[in-house]
């Protein structure tokens, strides 16, 4: 039986506790739910059957994304049950590539708040803002400033969908409990004129500040996280290449920080290169490499590849 201080409608409005038609008769009696939900007890399999039926009626992946996010806002358990019932089918809907279209239209498809939104205008009060988050034991924050979302460029506040989606993968793929996760958007403005003139844009209607102002804002944020959530790892996601590399170097020796674009993509790609070389019967140092552009992922891979080449006997200059 569920153990919670919440009862009745309050419980049904909490997506982390709501099970809708899956509450047992004993739970309905104990939690004040009799008459508030249909008088049946469904299995998760039957609930999933209904979800799939409703998804089949959606004509596009964007509409399926909107449906699934709405499900997440009402019943977290059923959302993750759905995603993990068929990861190959659902991960491209809740994250890349569909998340790209969702971010482009974020202000237009927005339903209700998820995560936190922290504006640069709150400088000097960042710690107080973080204390507004209801969960006090946050283990991972995924944070973006919307500076370079996927391959779409500066999306500003529309990029808030990225940390939301990325942390869904933490739970769906790694089993991290959702209550330990906090999606975060740092609003330092945008240079995207289209969004600055869009009445439904949800971010600050100012162009981006100087680099020094941005880094000062991020400094306060990172320090505030150490004080409010001392067990937390900060995951930087989809910053510009310059900012991604700089912020990682700025904090990595002092705090628990990680950049998926610089480190995660690089690690996975290098692993693929190493195994491809094994299949060919060659070594990394025997190959030539072409990088298209110099984004954060490319820079991260180039640095890691150089380290791997040095490990195979080359000098850093040769690498």
Task: Annotate each PLM feature.
Residues 254, 259-319:
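Glycine-rich phosphate/diphosphate-binding loop of Rossmann-like nucleotide-binding domains
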């Amino acid at each position: 039986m569920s153990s919670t201080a919440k009862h009745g409608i309050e419980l049904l409005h909490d997506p982390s506790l709501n099970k809708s038609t899956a509450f047992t008769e004993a739970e309905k009696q104990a939690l004040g739910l009799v008459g508030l939900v249909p008088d049946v007890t469904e299995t998760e399999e039957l609930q999933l059957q209904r979800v799939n039926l409703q998804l089949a009626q959606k004509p596009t992946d964007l509409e399926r994304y909107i449906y699934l996010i709405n499900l997440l806002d009402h019943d977290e358990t059923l959302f993750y049950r759905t995603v993990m019932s068929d990861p190959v089918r659902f991960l491209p809907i809740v994250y890349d590539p569909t998340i790209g279209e969702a971010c482009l239209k974020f202000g237009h498809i927005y339903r209700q708040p998820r995560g936190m939104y922290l504006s640069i205008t709150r400088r000097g009060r960042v710690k107080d803002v973080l204390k507004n988050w209801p969960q006090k034991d946050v283990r991972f924050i995924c944070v973006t400033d919307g500076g370079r979302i996927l391959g779409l460029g500066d999306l500003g506040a529309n990029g808030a969908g990225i940390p939301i989606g990325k942390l869904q993968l933490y739970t769906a793929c790694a089993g991290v409990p959702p209550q330990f996760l906090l999606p975060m958007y740092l609003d330092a403005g945008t240079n995207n004129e289209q969004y600055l003139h869009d009445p439904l844009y949800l971010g600050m209607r100012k162009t981006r500040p100087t680099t020094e102002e941005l880094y000062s804002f991020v400094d306060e944020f990172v320090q505030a996280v150490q004080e409010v959530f001392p067990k937390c790892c900060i995951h930087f996601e989809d910053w510009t290449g310059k900012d991604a590399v700089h912020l990682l170097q700025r904090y990595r020796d002092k705090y628990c920080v990680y950049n998926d674009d610089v480190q995660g993509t690089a690690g996975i790609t290098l692993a693929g290169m190493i195994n491809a070389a094994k299949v060919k019967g060659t070594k990394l140092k025997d190959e030539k490499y072409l990088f298209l552009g110099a984004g954060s992922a490319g820079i991260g891979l180039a640095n890691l590849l150089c380290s791997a080449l040095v490990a195979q006997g080359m000098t850093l200059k040769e690498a």
